[in-house]
Amino acid sequence: GHNVGGWKYLSKQIIHQECHQKHIVFGMVDDKDIDSVMELLPKDAIYYWSQATTHRAIPSQVVAQKGLAHGLVGRVYDSVESAYMAALAIAVPNDFVFIGGSSYIVSDLLACLATPKE
């Protein structure tokens, strides 16, 4: 989900996801309605605010400030990879980890996962 229409559908699925804790790695780009999307996000999740590598990315600090204004709690990360790794480090087996907000966030994660680590 990278726009309000997509999040109306997706947020219902995330909210009803059976799990111990929801972890959401989230970032958006500057041509999307971030406030309307954040109104749809679950309040009971832990957020990992991030930004994609595109020049269109909203800085993760700004995303975090918007999140806080909507009652969403999380920490700021300077890359999708660092946010994802933090979520995995905290998550336990019955938790749910979601990565999204923008297709660019997902793209950065896929690039990270495809890069061999030394």
Per-region residue spans from a language model:
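Short glycine-/acidic-enriched loop or helix-start segments at secondary-structure transitions
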Residues: W7-K8, I34-S36, P59-S60, D108-A111
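Cofactor-binding loop segments of dinucleotide-utilizing enzymes, especially the Rossmann-like FAD-
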Residues: F26-D30, S50-A52, G101
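C-terminal helical cap/extension that packs against the catalytic core
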Residues: D35-F96
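Generic beta-sheet signal
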Residues: K22-I24, D95-I99
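Nucleotide phosphate-binding/pyrophosphate-handling subdomain across enzymes
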Residues: G1-I46
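Alpha-helix N-cap/helix-start capping motif
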Residues: G1-V4, E81, S103
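Glycine/aspartate-rich loop-and-adjacent alpha/beta segment that forms the canonical ThDP
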Residues: S102-E118
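Active-site catalytic pocket residues across diverse enzymes, especially alpha/beta-hydrolases
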Residues: I14, G67, A91, L113-K117
